[in-house]
Amino acid sequence: MAFQDPTYDQNKSRHINNSHLQGPNQETIEMKSKHVSFKPSRDFHTNDYSNNYIHGKSLPQQHVTNIENRVDGYPKLQKLFQAKAKQINQFATTPFGCKIGIDSIVPTLNHWIQNENLTFDVVMIGCLTENQFIYPILTQLPLDRLISKPGFLFIWANSQKINELTKLLNNEIWAKKFRRSEELVFVPIDKKSPFYPGLDQDDETLMEKMQWHCWMCITGTVRRSTDGHLIHCNVDTDLSIETKDTTNGAVPSHLYRIAENFSTATRRLHIIPARTGYETPVKVRPGWVIVSPDVMLDNFSPKRYKEEIANLGSNIPLKNEIELLRPRSPVQKAQ
């Protein structure tokens, strides 16, 4: 019969001998949970939209969740957008359209400049359609006399044409008159969109450019910190994505809203040097004079327009409610 120590506990001995095989106790786990590692992890989560497009033909912009309501979750910005839209409609001229051929655009605008003494504070050239004759407009038209100082110029074109126009905008003579400020981008939701560029081209390329680009240029000197009566509610993002509410037409309403929110000017002109056809109509908009071969209304009168501007004023007046809500440039501290 084997001798057995009276102090020996078989279960306790098994527990002690096997302690090195068990995991850490609760106290050790709590200590490790408090430790935070700042080293980058090798395994990280990525949204591989290129892979999604290859396998499911789903474009990256279709995965953006807040394109329908860009200010969702920001009640202050929602209130600002509503108040600003209401004020813009209140101080807008009659929707004017000037229906003329492409070859008559430059002579007509020259007549307005020389004989009617018309100037505009905001001028937008181009739309979301192909075959635009933008280069002749920029080279033949005295835009420095058509646009007031300070003033704003928006030029919309596809990726190919905007690269050609960039060479012109970098020209020394042009740079003295207009200072290129920002670039805006509009992206259609998919290839079925009427705004998808290159639909009239039959050849297929490996890489397709689907964006529309806009160069925003400024005449004169404008500072955000001191010229709040000119640059007012610049809360729109530089990237715009087509929404379900975007109506069929040559110009989405969001393109107009960017210019309306950016500047308080009431004298706005839109030049569309292209035939858009009946499938993509050019609709008039309150507060704008739209010059196009296919504009749906031809009612522009320089005399009537100047009378309405005289009653409204050349700038939208400041409103306390909007002033309290709109973002401002930070005030620099005196050193």
Curated annotation (Swiss-Prot):
Name listed for the protein in its UniProt record: Karyogamy protein KAR4
InterPro entries (UniProt xref): METTL14-like (IPR045123), MT-A70-like (IPR007757)
Family to which this protein belongs: Belongs to the MT-A70-like family.
Pfam families for the chain: MT-A70
Subcellular location: Nucleus; Cytoplasm
Source organism per UniProt: Saccharomyces cerevisiae (strain ATCC 204508 / S288c) (Baker's yeast)
Keywords, comma-separated and alphabetical: Cytoplasm, Karyogamy, Meiosis, Nucleus
GO molecular function: DNA-binding transcription factor activity; mRNA binding
Principal localisation: nucleus
Subunit structure: Component of the MIS (mRNA N6-methyladenosine (m6A) methylation) complex, at least composed of IME4, KAR4, MUM2, SLZ1, and VIR1. Interacts with VIR1.
Lineage: Eukaryota, Fungi, Dikarya, Ascomycota, Saccharomycotina
Outcome of mutating M207R: Decreases interaction with VIR1
Biological function: Component of the MIS complex, a complex that mediates N6-methyladenosine (m6A) methylation of meiotic mRNAs and is required for initiation of meiosis, progression through the meiotic divisions and sporulation. May assist STE12 in the pheromone-dependent expression of KAR3 and CIK1.
Disordered: region residues: 1-25
GO CC term, one of those recorded: cytoplasm
UniProt cross-references to PANTHER family, sorted A to Z: N6-ADENOSINE-METHYLTRANSFERASE NON-CATALYTIC SUBUNIT
